[in-house]
Each structure stands twice: as structure tokens, then as C-alpha cells.
Amino acid sequence: MEEKKMQYLFGMHPVLEAVKAGRKFDKVLLKQGLEGPQFRELMELLKNNEIPFQFVPGERLNRAVRGAHQGVLAYISQIDYVDIEQLVNNALGSSQNPLLVILDGVSDVRNLGAIARSLECAGGQGIIVPAKGGAAINADAVKASAGALMRMDTCKVSNLRVAAYYLQQSGFKLIAATEKTENLIYDVDMTGPCAIIMGSEGKGISQAMLDLADEKAAIPMAGEITSLNVSVASAVLMYEAVRQRIRK
């Protein structure tokens, strides 16, 4: 997404104070070669708060900001995130059989938004995304979700595998959507609490997440094209869960 379309703060002191105050950011751009005590303090805070950051040439910041950015540009989060414990508590508190989605490397913001929209329509409770290596939840994602991202819990985690294991220990079945199985989606019981794992558009689900999954499920393909767009595939699995729960 173009930087001028996003909400942001710039300047070393404003960003430093905002991070100290607990303001949520999608990412922070830092000019290459920054030094000094305030820079070191900011770096420590970004790491401790697991806020993604990137070093970029000063020209990029000059194009994005008409002002004294001092080498720091921070993009404000479009939504308020919850931690994994709060996500689980809210999900189990609102439904006997909650439905969650884990996005393992989905990089397109419109796909992310479309997945969130389908999940909300299917009665799902929340979505889990990686802090790094996935699509940013920005204005485009919120728009593509038709506001769904504002209506459900979103959890951003530094380690997807640890978060997924926590879900397992909390009673959720992990279902990986993959063609690397003979089990079709109709063969997998989705009537209880479950989290559907969806992989990246190009590589699919990582091996680490596949190894952790309780079940693997494939969508049957009858045509010559062998795969669906990730947002469409997500909706197919979600509504198979809905179908099973209605018939239960």
C-alpha cells in the first residue's frame, strides 16, 4: 500500500513517546545509519514490544513525509490486537465450538481481508497472523474485510507454532488446508473447537505447521486448474465447518 494513504507518526521523539504509551504500530521505518541514545532506546522498545521495523534509505522517508522525520516513520495500526490468551478466552466464552483461522504467511492484504470477511460471516471468533512475514492489516485489508476486522479478535504473534500449540492445549483442533493428504474436507470432523490453518499464496503451509496439525484436509478439485485462491479456499473450509455444525 502507498505510504501516503496510511496513518502514521514521524520524528524520533513522537514515535518514541507513542511506543512508551502503548500505541500499536504495524511497522516502523528507520533511516539507514541512525545512531545515538534515543535511537538505541527506540530499538530496544521496538524489540521488546515485538513491533516490526525495517531500515530503509532516507529517500524513501523523504518521499513519504513532508516534514522533519528525523529518520523515523511509524505506521499506526488500523485495529486493536489481542494476545493469544485473550483470544482463546473470548472465543471459548462466546461459543461452545469456536472457529478460528491461522494465516501462515498469507501476504496479500486483500486476501487477508476477504478471509476475515468470510470468517465473520461463518460465525468465526478470531484470526491469528504472524508479526513478520504476512500481510499488513492496513486500511486496504480493513476495506476488503467489509469491516469484519473491526468486529472480531485479531491476534498478532511472533511465533505461529507456539501460538498454535497453545490453541491445542486449550482444546482446539488444528486443521491444515493442504493438497498433501488423501483426506477430503468432508472426512474431517469440524464440529468442535477448531482452528483452520491457511498457507501462503505461493508456498502453502510451512512444514513446521503441517507437522503440528491434528488433521490435514484437501478440497476436491474436478477441473484442470489444481488450486483455489487462498481466500476462496478458506471460505470453502469455513463453510464445511458450518455445514457440519448445522447437521450435528
Residue ranges and their predicted role:
Residues I175-V230:
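Active-site/ligand-binding-proximal alpha/beta "capping" segment
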Residues K47, A164-Q168, V242:
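Surface-exposed amphipathic alpha-helices with a cationic face
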Residues L16, A21-G22, K143-A148, Q207-K248:
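Structured adenosyl-cofactor binding patch, chiefly the S-adenosyl-L-methionine
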